[in-house]
């Protein structure tokens, strides 16, 4: 110990043996250590002086300074007493040795907090995060920016809380969870990660969406307005509620999420439930113009392309929004709906025709909301139709003709005829009647050939619809009667057709169709229907006898020239009803006491006749019922045919089929005596008796011959078929007769 504590000599005073025994400790190292100790001592003294200047002198300050210096002295004594242990502490626990007075003062002063010089303002996201973290129940708070998984228990708790008493904080939680559920359906991973909640289970998704669709709107309405108002038809804007300021942001987020959900659903039943929920949320959408435009855009798409029930619900939402916000939304929505209508009318078939008719009627109802706005759109689009027709008439090219003779053009004519017939009483739209009727007449006269008779019939129906409701005379009958003069109904058809022609879904006939018998059958039926429909609208007119005179003459001329019994029967029945109605009007006119120039008296007389009814109107009502029933049966028959499960034909293997065929042939050639006895009954009374299969064939042949005979008689042909028994007799030949030869006297 004495040797260790003795002062160390310098290197130059040591011998070689002493230097090697000293453990390679140089004097420079000891000098460096001494200098380091001096620096630490000066630093500690400076820190003590600084702390003494900061803090007021007192017993607590002196106590802290004494503890620090005492601990430091203990470490220095440990270094002298046990240098090996001190070295061990340096290598393994350096923090214990690097102790200064500042550390002790920092620990003692830690409970005290000093404010920074500048304060930062909190952002909206931080505020939301703080509110959300406070609103979450204990045990569900997770790490920062980590979404909370939604469970069925949470959804049930939200449902019970909303039914009992909905609060703004609870509504905020439900909206955040609903947004997370919608984000998962759209596949937006970034949006789902930014949400506060996470919906990963399909059962939780269904429960949450069902709760929001069924219960949330009613609870929100109760929270805003309390009791339901007595006048349920009156629209209550949620902005009038005193709580609207607290709920406005959450309601806006919820409406955006609902529109996104309606856009991504594929199941018709679920989409229908969401659309019904949207219909109840219309007052909230009216408060936010941006969300309302998003909603209307989506509803127009569903109205034009969705399933039938979805189309109806989407239209109800559209008309409800436009009824309350005509100035803001009616004009753009009418334009968008017309564009979608034209786009969906490009092709027409029996399956798409009801949907096109639905779009016509609903678009007409939208145009009826404001006649002044409707006039602007009607004038623009009717003028566009007139420009297409003028180009086709002036150039005469095939391309320009195709721009007129297509389904889109024809359905647009139908639409505006329906609109003007519905709003014809409005003085704003009356100036458009004459241009529209002239466009339709020009469309008929563009190519007046037999191939475009179906298109002519569509135009005639549009003119009839226009003339029925507005009370304006339009010369429709000449375009119908002209066909009787152009078509030869007595001409024998070039080929037989397998099915009738549906004139309601075609615009043009092919050259093959013009040679078929079904073409003339369907054409005559369509002509009789068109005459009946137009004359039904004029049956109460005081000038009906004079109006139908050209028609009566043309029908009588047809009956004199036509030789087909079926055609004559249809025309004769129509002619009788027209003449009966003319005689009825003449008998009523004889008892009239007013002059024909008295317009008021004439209108009153025609109104009375319409209310009482005429023979032609009663016949038309009965005919219309039968025709609608035929159409329904045809549609239902097609549906049954589609749903019918035809039996499968199970083909046998080649080996099995050969074995069975050999067995059948073997049994066939093994003749018994009974078969020989039965074969004697083949001839009876000198006339061959046919087997049962041949007898059935004979009956079928007789029925076919009978049908062919009827059809030939209708076409003016008198040829008859040959019976199978007659063919058999002809093959047998007549019995030979022996006659005496008579020789003349000259031989």
Swiss-Prot record:
Q: Does the keyword Ribonucleoprotein apply?
A: no
Q: In which tissues is it expressed?
A: Ubiquitous.
The biased composition feature labelled Acidic residues covers 100-110, 118-134, 670-681, 700-720, 736-747
Region (Disordered), start-end ranges: 23-84, 98-145, 669-747
Primary location: nucleus
Basic and acidic residues: compositionally biased ranges: 36-52, 67-84, 682-699
GO terms in the biological process aspect are: apoptotic process; negative regulation of transcription by RNA polymerase II
Q: Does the keyword Nucleus apply?
A: yes
One GO MF term on file is: p53 binding
Q: What residues bear Phosphoserine in this entry?
A: 95, 673-674, 744
**Record-annotated disulphide pairs:** none
Cite the entry's keywords alphabetically.
Apoptosis, Nucleus, Phosphoprotein, Repressor, Transcription, Transcription regulation
TM spans (from-to): none
What is one GO cellular-component annotation here? nucleus
Q: Where in the cell is it found?
A: Nucleus, Nucleoplasm; Nucleus, Nucleolus
InterPro entries on file: ARM-type_fold, Noc2
Cited function: Acts as an inhibitor of histone acetyltransferase activity; prevents acetylation of all core histones by the EP300/p300 histone acetyltransferase at p53/TP53-regulated target promoters in a histone deacetylases (HDAC)-independent manner. Acts as a transcription corepressor of p53/TP53- and TP63-mediated transactivation of the p21/CDKN1A promoter. Involved in the regulation of p53/TP53-dependent apoptosis.
Per UniProt, subunit arrangement is: Interacts with p53/TP53. Interacts (via the N- and C-terminus domains) with AURKB (via the middle kinase domain). Interacts with TP63 (via activation domain). Interacts with histone H3 (via N-terminus and non-acetylated form preferentially). Associates with core histones and nucleosomes.
Tell me the protein family, please.
Belongs to the NOC2 family.
Q: What is this protein called?
A: Nucleolar complex protein 2 homolog
